[in-house]
Amino acid sequence: MTSAAAIPTVILNDDNTMPVIGLGVGELSDAEAEQSVLAALEAGYRLIDTAAAYGNEAAVGRAIAKSGVPRGELFVTTKLATDDLGFQSSQDALRASLERLGLDYVDLYLIHWPAGSQGTYVDSWGGLMKLKELGLTRSIGVSNFHAQHLDDIIGLSFFTPAVNQIELHPLLNQAELRAVNAEHGIVTEAYSPLGVGSLLSNPAVTAIADAQDRTPAQVLIRWSLQLGNVVISRSSSPERIKSNLDVFDFELTADQMAALDGLDEGTRFRPDPETYTGS
């Protein structure tokens, strides 16, 4: 089993460090989120990813408190909901998130979606810059931002996000956006790495899993890690949570990586950031 000390980290463009693998709690109930976070922290995870829009920040906070893991060992991410976009409202929203989480600061605060007008998410970015200055978040970043969205906030603020969290799996490998992120020194963080489960039975994935004597989920997570991404996966099963962390003692071959790269067809299981207006 992988221990917390054995999980590699990446240095962000603001010199903070971030574990390369974590647990996400999107779409989990309070009870599921609390159980999953407790199981993850016990298994060795230290990156926990939630969001105001998930409605389970308080449950995540309870699990963190119950775990006994020192705050300094954790990397906690939450996200700004679309309803709270704006310079001042983004600041008020993080303070409310911190109260629900029972924390004095988060390690990473993300704009969840580039919804609304350009001015709205650019103003929100200014709010996040202020929150970083105040020490309420150590790092700031974005989620679901495309190249033009990134150009907007960087060009108008002269401050580059540390992280861009995006849907990413072999059916949507995001090669162009990953390259844009890299050009800016932005870490790509992959969510939905299993294609919301649809890839677990894909013949190319299962063939590699058989060859490596690994689970399909481990193969998919390992593929994303070898691309240089930070990866967050979601599960409410303690057994799968443990298994999904056990990905640091094997490597996919160049041919296996190429086979998974070749599955790309632009398939999204989550909303398209170009058209999404929700939270």
Curated annotation (Swiss-Prot):
Membrane-spanning segments: none
UniProt-annotated binding residues for NADPH: 194, 196, 232, 234-235, 240, 243-244, 270
Entries under Gene3D superfamilies matching the protein: NADP-dependent oxidoreductase domain
EC number in record: 1.1.1.-
GO molecular function, one term: aldo-keto reductase (NADPH) activity
Active site: 54
SUPFAM superfamilies, per the entry: NAD(P)-linked oxidoreductase
Enzyme class at the top of the EC tree: oxidoreductase
Name of the protein: Aldo-keto reductase Mvan_2161
Record organism: Mycolicibacterium vanbaalenii (strain DSM 7251 / JCM 13017 / BCRC 16820 / KCTC 9966 / NRRL B-24157 / PYR-1) (Mycobacterium vanbaalenii)
Source lineage: Bacteria, Bacillati, Actinomycetota, Actinomycetes, Mycobacteriales
